[in-house]
From Swiss-Prot:
PANTHER family listed in its UniProt record: PHYCOBILIPROTEIN APCE (PTHR34011:SF6), PHYCOBILISOME 32.1 KDA LINKER POLYPEPTIDE, PHYCOCYANIN-ASSOCIATED, ROD 2-RELATED (PTHR34011)
Similarity comment text for this entry: Belongs to the phycobilisome linker protein family.
Organism from which the protein derives: Mastigocladus laminosus
Record's protein name: Phycobilisome 34.5 kDa linker polypeptide, phycoerythrocyanin-associated, rod
Coiled coil regions in record: none
Length: 279
């Protein structure tokens, strides 16, 4: 995804935001890991988190735990429960766990049902561990990368609805998960239950749900957005075991077809390389 498109989507600071605790780290680098972890796991509430986790910070600083285990301690903490568990519906809590711990939105009803059943059978800690000790987490973050929002770009195993769904959960860096329009209710329940993609809409708040009229890439098509975009993609090679050269394809797409084109390319096994405004 190009920088200009990421700016229009208000996600420039989140795309490719990979913070890793490397060997021979400095104290400044460790502090960046702490700050990023608090922001990812707690969102806006992360501003108040650091003094609550002095013991966990000491364990990571002294090499007793990995970044993955540090994230686990945060997500199993009473503070995380106070922020997201006690005051939200169960499905909303699952949505937020996907967002905070795997950096994406849940794709379909089977993922929601799995976690509902897991919590009922094994409890809170097992629910948190199911994300952090999953093959997906290991492949994406390993032991020393802080989770980040991956759903804005093509990722292995991603379903096409994931791109739209993450925008329903991520409403801007300054937005709080607990102060969004929709309150404690699940954001994805209706679309997931109907197996439909979510519509990408501008960020809103309970106070100012309709105050913004700025025309951006996420402006609703009904506002008459007539811009065109150039989508560059690498062709897919579905249903074949033969090694072939994958060609680069270029599409000129109107705004209101952008999401559909994204989905069509991924259904054919392709990968989007760049999206730029047409001059």
């Amino acid at each position: 995804m190009s920088t200009s498109v990421a700016e229009r989507l208000a996600i420039k600071d989140e795309v490719d935001k990979k913070i890793e605790l490397r060997p021979n780290w400095s104290e400044d680098e460790l502090q960046i890991v702490f700050k990023t972890a608090y922001e990812q796991v707690f969102g806006r509430q992360g501003l108040y988190a650091s003094q609550r986790f002095a013991t966990a910070e000491a364990l990571l600083r002294n090499g007793k735990i990995s970044v993955k285990q540090f994230i686990e301690l945060l997500a199993k903490s009473e503070f995380y429960k106070e922020c997201f568990f006690y005051n939200n519906s169960q499905v909303r809590f699952i949505e937020l766990n996907y967002k905070h711990l795997l950096g994406r939105a849940p794709y379909d009803q089977s993922e929601i049902a799995f976690h509902v059943d897991l919590y009922a059978a094994a409890g809170y800690d097992a629910e948190i561990e199911s994300y952090i000790y999953s093959p997906e987490y290991d492949n994406a973050f390993g032991n020393f990368v802080v989770p980040y929002y991956r759903g804005f770009q093509s990722i292995p195993g991603m379903k096409t609805v994931g791109f739209n769904r993450i925008f329903e959960l991520y409403r801007g860096r300054a937005n709080s998960d607990n102060a969004q329009f929709g309150g404690k209710s699940a954001r994805l329940r209706s679309k997931i239950s109907m197996n439909l993609a979510n519509t990408i809409v501008p960020p809103t708040s309970p106070i100012a749900a309709s105050t913004s009229s700025a025309r951006t890439l996420v402006t609703s098509p009904v506002m008459g957005d007539a811009r065109m975009f150039i989508v560059e993609a690498i062709a897919g090679t579905l249903n074949t075991n033969v090694a072939v050269r994958r060609s680069r394809q270029v599409y000129t797409v109107p705004y209101d077809r952008l999401s559909a084109t994204y989905q069509e390319i991924h259904k054919r096994g392709g990968k989007i390389v760049k999206i730029t405004p047409a001059s």
